[in-house]
Amino acid sequence: MNPSTAQARVVVDELVRGGVRDVVLCPGSRNAPLAFALHDADRAGRLRLHVRIDERTAGFLAIGLAVAERAPVCVAMTSGTAVANLGPAVVEANYARVPLIVLTANRPYELLGTGANQTFEQLGYFGTQVRESISLGLAGDHADMGSLNAQWRSATCRVLVAAKGSRSANAGPVQFDIPLREPLVPDADDGSAYAPEGRPGGKEWTYTPAVTFDQPLEIDLTPDTVVIAGHGAGVHPNLAHLPTVAEPTAPYAQTPLHPLALSLIRPRQVIMLGRPTLHRSVSTLLADPAVPVFALTTGPRWPDVSGNSQATGTRAVTSGAASPEWLRRCAEVNRHAVEAVRGQLAAHPLTTGLHVAAVVADAVGPGDQLVLGASNPVRDIALVGFNTADVKVRSNRGVAGIDGTVSTAIGAALAHERATGGRTVALIGDLTFVHDSSGLLVGPTEPTPRKLTIVVSNDNGGGIFELLEQGDPRFSDVSSRIFGTPHDVDVGALCRAYHVESTQIEAGELAAALAEDFDGMRVLEVKADRSSLRALHASIKAGL
């Protein structure tokens, strides 16, 4: 067995022992030893392999798998620009704390700076965005394979520990750079997938128990308190009775408080869970120096955009009790805000993305998974009052980019189907869909979702800018082109190019379409208007 083949087989074997169940592979020559080893493991049923031709979408497919599985997922690629294309996914994984392992095949390090083809200083390329950048070192002919086997397995365990946050409580992306020398394919007489042995019984070479990160924080609940639950909020049963502004990706709120209702009440303190990113009303409250903020997170970092947090911890140790009158008032304004939104939607003469979101919110139920685009859809779902128990909600909120959303949805759907057999509904805008349309390319030999519906709310451009400063009517002569970016893409034709079923329907037909039994992956396109979004949102606020 040649050294590169042995090294790749050992790495793959140890990754499987460490909990990796899915790997995304992009084709290339330099990563051929890894490709052969991964294919052997896939064929043996030890992991599930997904082959993609675009490294950028491959990275987000891996993120979708990792988030839904709550387990590390690898993406493997060749050297050169293939590595650079993982940049967006690595940044998202960093801030969303996703255990993404980037297996970067490299040329022997002595070729750096020589002008060798497809070669650059890729080890450490991701800089501060990864938990670790680890090099396996170059495999060479060596009489003591036992020593090399131990070194390779030990390094792989370090990668897994860093990605899972086993010693830091801070999961995230890791670069695992593996320089490989020719030959890059198995020897002609190497007829089996043999690899040097690991620990007996399939155990990890170096076992590291997960660290317990526990910082109790005493909080008196006597002052009128609201909970703001953002991305990665975690579950806090002793706070469940408090009025909670829960972003869609936060756990189900037993006592919901609509984000627009914050303008109708005067909280005396805030308990912030996770990382809120969506609502300006929330940002305004968190920045109020007269309102103490207690930040509870599941890891070592905590958000504090305004610098107003008074104390931090991981869980609350509570004293005192909320006033019944305060709880009653919050429940009342929550109902009022939800009714104001739904009432204005019913009265509005045009179909907008908010209307599409309302249908989707009402259609998903327990056991479903909902994937949301990072622009208007995730905000719209919150505004229409979505708060359904036992629905897994995913959205790339780490740095909230629109890139890779189709691929994230496919990865999440594959993981959700394997775990529960349930369906996945994705709600995304047209720009988000077009931006990652190559994510629809799933080869005929690759695992494909059997219960994925992608709802594309198509208002032919960037509807979110209608609601921002750039959408002010005084910029109307230029904003449509440089912010709205109309594209006139034929969504149906684009889907047909990738052999994905697509149907254009009216908003009034969407509920029935979502209720249909469907086997496979499909796109439901709903035409929407963005020119009236600003007026619609103004009428909602006026209705409060």
From Swiss-Prot:
<comment type="pathway">
    <text>Quinol/quinone metabolism; 1,4-dihydroxy-2-naphthoate biosynthesis; 1,4-dihydroxy-2-naphthoate from chorismate: step 2/7.</text>
</comment>
<keyword id="KW-0464">Manganese</keyword>
<dbReference type="GO" id="GO:0030145">
    <property type="term" value="F:manganese ion binding"/>
</dbReference>
<comment type="subunit">
    <text>Homodimer.</text>
</comment>
<keyword id="KW-0786">Thiamine pyrophosphate</keyword>
<dbReference type="GO" id="GO:0070204">
    <property type="term" value="F:2-succinyl-5-enolpyruvyl-6-hydroxy-3-cyclohexene-1-carboxylic-acid synthase activity"/>
</dbReference>
<keyword id="KW-0808">Transferase</keyword>
<dbReference type="GO" id="GO:0030976">
    <property type="term" value="F:thiamine pyrophosphate binding"/>
</dbReference>
<keyword id="KW-0460">Magnesium</keyword>
<protein>
    <recommendedName>
        <fullName>2-succinyl-5-enolpyruvyl-6-hydroxy-3-cyclohexene-1-carboxylate synthase</fullName>
        <ecNumber>2.2.1.9</ecNumber>
    </recommendedName>
</protein>
<dbReference type="InterPro" id="IPR012001">
    <property type="entry name" value="Thiamin_PyroP_enz_TPP-bd_dom"/>
</dbReference>
<dbReference type="GO" id="GO:0000287">
    <property type="term" value="F:magnesium ion binding"/>
</dbReference>
<comment type="similarity">
    <text>Belongs to the TPP enzyme family. MenD subfamily.</text>
</comment>
<dbReference type="GO" id="GO:0009234">
    <property type="term" value="P:menaquinone biosynthetic process"/>
</dbReference>
<comment type="pathway">
    <text>Quinol/quinone metabolism; menaquinone biosynthesis.</text>
</comment>
<dbReference type="InterPro" id="IPR029061">
    <property type="entry name" value="THDP-binding"/>
</dbReference>
<keyword id="KW-0479">Metal-binding</keyword>
<keyword id="KW-0474">Menaquinone biosynthesis</keyword>
<dbReference type="Pfam" id="PF02776">
    <property type="entry name" value="TPP_enzyme_N"/>
</dbReference>
<comment type="function">
    <text>Catalyzes the thiamine diphosphate-dependent decarboxylation of 2-oxoglutarate and the subsequent addition of the resulting succinic semialdehyde-thiamine pyrophosphate anion to isochorismate to yield 2-succinyl-5-enolpyruvyl-6-hydroxy-3-cyclohexene-1-carboxylate (SEPHCHC).</text>
</comment>
<dbReference type="InterPro" id="IPR004433">
    <property type="entry name" value="MenaQ_synth_MenD"/>
</dbReference>
